[in-house]
Amino acid sequence: MIKNGLPHEPEFQQAYNELVSALEESTLFTEKPEYKKVIPVVSIPERIIQFRVAWENDNGDVEVNNGFRVQFNSSLGPYKGGLRFHPSVNLSILKFLGFEQIFKNALTGLSMGGGKGGCDFNPKGRSDGEIRRFCVAFMRQLARYIGADTDVPAGDIGVGGREIGYLFGAYKQMQNNWYGVLTGKGLTWGGSLIRPEATGYVSFTTLKKMIEKATNGKESFKGKRVELSGSGNVAQYAALKVIELGGIVVSLSDSKGSIVSKNGIVPEQVLEIAAAKLKFKSLEEITKESVKLFSGENSVEYLAGVRPWAKVGHFDVALPSATQKEVSGEEEAKALVEAGCKYIAEGSNMGSTKEAIDVFEANRSNNVWYAPGKAANCGGVAVSGLEMAQNSQRVQWSAEEVDAKLKNIMYTCFDNCYDPAIKYSAEKNADGLPSLLKGANIASFIKVADAMFDQGDVY
């Protein structure tokens, strides 16, 4: 394998290895050996910015956090990727996310490069005033490095609509102009319709296409038992869409535990969870405070300290939608396969460990089909790209127009992953389900590599 020499950055190393392995295990480098020259260049960020964020808490004391922005690759357009506020944030995680973002954005077909940023600040338990002051301090350091045609951040874990508002307001005051420099904005000040639900809906759309393709259109979501992790935006909207089309959602989770349901979680429960999560409540607190809603015919069981993968019996579909590496290899991936799961699509970035992915790929011959995050959860960034286009024109498209454009992007994205998986397959038995993992990596890499050759970054 082409090495990058960064074993001290495990998250980034996994993302790098996944891409390079997919390319080396295909016929791409045999047919087009010049593409090998791109790997050492594309795997190093164009720029990494690290800065101090000093801010005042409610006691009048100064607190300090580490802020970052990884501007990874701009060959296809301005750097584009979210901001994450979470105590786990470090450079390895942001480099992994930024690296993935390059290729995820490439699959949308929109003019966006790849980047990621954030801070090790934890918004949980903080007052609204503290979060506002922190956002202003963070933007004071970041503002000089971003712009509508340079770098357009968005939200991520710990950065929702409230935080985007504070960040945008701070940027506007500092720069004395109104640019579409952030996406995920409010609908009355430059946001796009369908943005909040896009990632969850599109993860669902990818699964829908997988089921249709694998069964030649004979099966749909109706009656399928779907195991979801997470309980944030992605999981909430994916759950509602699954239920709408006749599927049965059997689990949700958060950092403290999981809820599982034999008969299926209902929309009223999802909406209650969504409202409570805005107040940073745990699933345990929510189920205890709303006993009537979560008992009786629609009862759920709360399981403390565990993920849901091996806890619900038989199910057909898995949608990891919480955070990175939430499906492990030896135990959880094998448990998914043994429970009858046939379709796995990552609503989160790097939702599965390398060992878990190996289990899924090894079982493609048993009709187990896996879609990586860059192919399955690019709906959010696709609508972010559409929000950038609307901001440039100073217009707001209707929900129907955004939805139509998003569906076209996602169907094209699926085909763009499916076709190269077959075209560049080096597998002896290529009659079964093609590897969407390899297809997504090949298709996105070719697009980025061609742009880098054209622009003289590689020659």
UniProtKB/Swiss-Prot annotation:
Going by the UniProt record, its keywords in alphabetical order are: NADP, Oxidoreductase
Annotated S-S bridges: none
Q: What is its EC number?
A: 1.4.1.4
Name the active site residues: 116
Q: One biological process GO term for this chain?
A: glutamate biosynthetic process
Q: Which Gene Ontology cellular-component terms appear in the entry?
A: cytosol
The record's section on PANTHER family has: NADP-SPECIFIC GLUTAMATE DEHYDROGENASE 1-RELATED
What's this protein's name? NADP-specific glutamate dehydrogenase
Species the sequence originates in: Schwanniomyces occidentalis
Q: What is the lineage of its organism?
A: Eukaryota, Fungi, Dikarya, Ascomycota, Saccharomycotina
Gene (UniProt): GDHA
